[in-house]
Amino acid sequence: MDPRLSAVRQTCCCFNVRIATTALAIYHVIMSVLLFIEHSVEVAHGKASCKLSQMGYLRIADLISSFLLIAMLFIISLSLLIGVVKNREKYLLPFLSLQVMDYLLCLLTLLGSYIELPAYLKLASRSRASPSKFPLMTLQLLDFCLSILTLCSSYMEVPTYLNFKSMNHMNYLPSQEDMPHNQFIKMMIIFSIAFITVLIFKVYMFKCVWRCYRFIKCMNSVEEKRNSKMLQKVVLPSYEEALSLPSKTPEGGPAPPPYSEV
C-alpha cells in the first residue's frame, strides 16, 4: 500500500470510514424522504399554518421555500452517497458544511435550553380537525421516533423552518408552570445528558465523513501520480527525420541496403 494511504486512518472507533459514511448517507436520504412525506401530509390535511384558503403571497413563498429546503437536503445527502461510491471527494464537501452548521446550531440550542425545557421532550397530543383512524398512542410513538431520528441526524433545525415560525426557540419551548420545580430540574438533567450524547454522536459522524474525505482524496492523488508515471507512447520518426539521425552502424560493418521504391 502507498505510504500516503497508510498514513490516513481508514477506521474510526472500530468502524470503517467508507462503510460508516455510506450508512450515514443512506440514513440521511431516508430522513429527507420522511421529512418530505410528513410535511406533504401536514399540508394536505390543512394544518393551521398551511391552509391554502388563508394563504397569501408570503405564506406561498414560505411553503415553496420549505419544499425547496427538503429538496436541497436530499440533493446534499445524495451527493454524499455518490461521492463515497464513486470516489469523488468534492461531493462530500456540501455535507461536511451542513454538519458544521448543524453542530453549531445544536450547541446554541443546548445553551439556550437551560432557560426552558424543549418541547420535544413532552409528548403532547396534537389537536386534529377530524377523528383519526389510528390510536393516539401510536401516533405519539411515531412522532417521537421521527423526532429522535431527526435529532440524531444533521437535519435537527429543519422542523423549525418547516413550522413557519420565527427563528426564536423561545416561541415553542414549554412553560415551567405546567410541572413542579423538582420535576423540571430532573427533566433538564435528563435532557442535558441526552443532548450532550447527541452532540458527541454528531462529532463522531463528522469525524467519519472527514476521514473518508481525506482517504478518497489521497487515493485519487496516488492514482493520478501513478498514471503520470506510466511510460508515454513513443512516436516513430518520419523518413526525413530518420535520415537526419546519426548512423548506428558499427565501424567496419556492412552498410544498410539503399532505399528503393518497389
Curated annotation (Swiss-Prot):
Q: What biological processes does GO assign it? A: cellular response to leukemia inhibitory factor; defense response to tumor cell; Golgi to lysosome transport; induction of programmed cell death; intrinsic apoptotic signaling pathway; negative regulation of activated T cell proliferation; negative regulation of autophagic cell death; negative regulation of B cell activation
Gene Ontology MF annotations: protein sequestering activity; ubiquitin protein ligase binding
InterPro entries (UniProt xref): LAPTM4/5, LAPTM_4A/5, LAPTM_transporter
Q: Where in the cell is it found?
A: Lysosome membrane
What cellular component GO annotations does this protein have? cytosol; lysosomal membrane; perinuclear region of cytoplasm; plasma membrane; protein-containing complex; transport vesicle
| Membrane protein topology class | Multi-pass membrane protein
Question: At what positions is Phosphotyrosine found?
Answer: Y259
Instruction: Report keywords, A-Z.
Output: Lysosome, Membrane, Phosphoprotein, Transmembrane, Transmembrane helix, Transport
Q: What is its main location?
A: membrane
> Which residues are listed as membrane-spanning?
19-39, 64-84, 92-112, 134-154, 184-204
Q: Which family does it belong to?
A: Belongs to the LAPTM4/LAPTM5 transporter family.
Q: What's the subunit arrangement here?
A: Binds to ubiquitin.
Q: What does this protein do?
A: May have a special functional role during embryogenesis and in adult hematopoietic cells.
Protein name per the record: Lysosomal-associated transmembrane protein 5
Q: What species is this protein from?
A: Pongo abelii (Sumatran orangutan)
